[in-house]
Amino acid sequence: MSMSTSTEIIAHHWAFAIFLIIAIGLCCLMLVGGWFLGGRARARSKNTPFESGIDSVGSARLRLSAKFYLVAMFFVIFDVEALYLFAWSTSIRESGWVGFVEAAIFIFVLLAGLVYLVRIGALDWTPARSRRERMNPETNSIANRQR
C-alpha cells in the first residue's frame, strides 16, 4: 500500500471517523453525568420493582400459552410476506410478467399454508368442548338439563 493510497483513504473517511468519536464521547458524557448527578438513595424499598403505581405480587416468571407464540410467528411470517410483495411492487415494471407469475406463486404457497393451518385447527383459540357446544347447541342443552 503506497503512501498516497492510505492518505486518500484517510481523506475520504475523516468525516465518518469524527462522527464516531463525537457520538461515542457524547454517550460516555451522558452516562458519566447521570452517574454523578443521579440520586444515591439506597433503601430496601428502592430495590423492589414498581410498575404503573402497583406493587408487584408473585413471581415474574409466568407461563404463557403457546398460542401467543403462534400468533407472533404468524405476524412475522406475514410481515415478511408484505415486505417481499412491497419490494416486488416497486420493481413491477422491470420484472414484467415473469415477476408477476413468481409473486403469484409466492402468494399461492402462503395462502395454501394458511388454509392448511385453518384446517388443522392451529388458528382455533377455543377448546374442543366449547367448539362442540357452539356447533350443536340443542344437544348440549339436553345434556345440561340431565346433570
Curated annotation (Swiss-Prot):
GO terms for cellular component: NADH dehydrogenase complex; plasma membrane. It comes from the Bacteria. The chain crosses the membrane at residues 16-36, 68-88, 98-118. InterPro entries: NAD(P)H_OxRDtase_bac/plastid (IPR023043), NADH_UbQ/plastoQ_OxRdtase_su3 (IPR000440), NDAH_ubi_oxred_su3_sf (IPR038430). Its main location: membrane. It catalyses: a quinone + NADH + 5 H(+)(in) = a quinol + NAD(+) + 4 H(+)(out). Its EC number is 7.1.1.-. It is found in: Cell inner membrane. Keywords: Cell inner membrane, Cell membrane, Membrane, NAD, Quinone, Translocase, Transmembrane, Transmembrane helix, Transport, Ubiquinone. GO terms for molecular function: NADH dehydrogenase (ubiquinone) activity; NADH:ubiquinone reductase (non-electrogenic) activity; quinone binding. It is a multi-pass membrane protein. It holds the Pfam family Oxidored_q4. NDH-1 is composed of 13 different subunits. Subunits NuoA, H, J, K, L, M, N constitute the membrane sector of the complex. NDH-1 shuttles electrons from NADH, via FMN and iron-sulfur (Fe-S) centers, to quinones in the respiratory chain. The immediate electron acceptor for the enzyme in this species is believed to be ubiquinone. Couples the redox reaction to proton translocation (for every two electrons transferred, four hydrogen ions are translocated across the cytoplasmic membrane), and thus conserves the redox energy in a proton gradient. Belongs to the complex I subunit 3 family. This is NADH-quinone oxidoreductase subunit A. It comes from Citrobacter koseri (strain ATCC BAA-895 / CDC 4225-83 / SGSC4696).
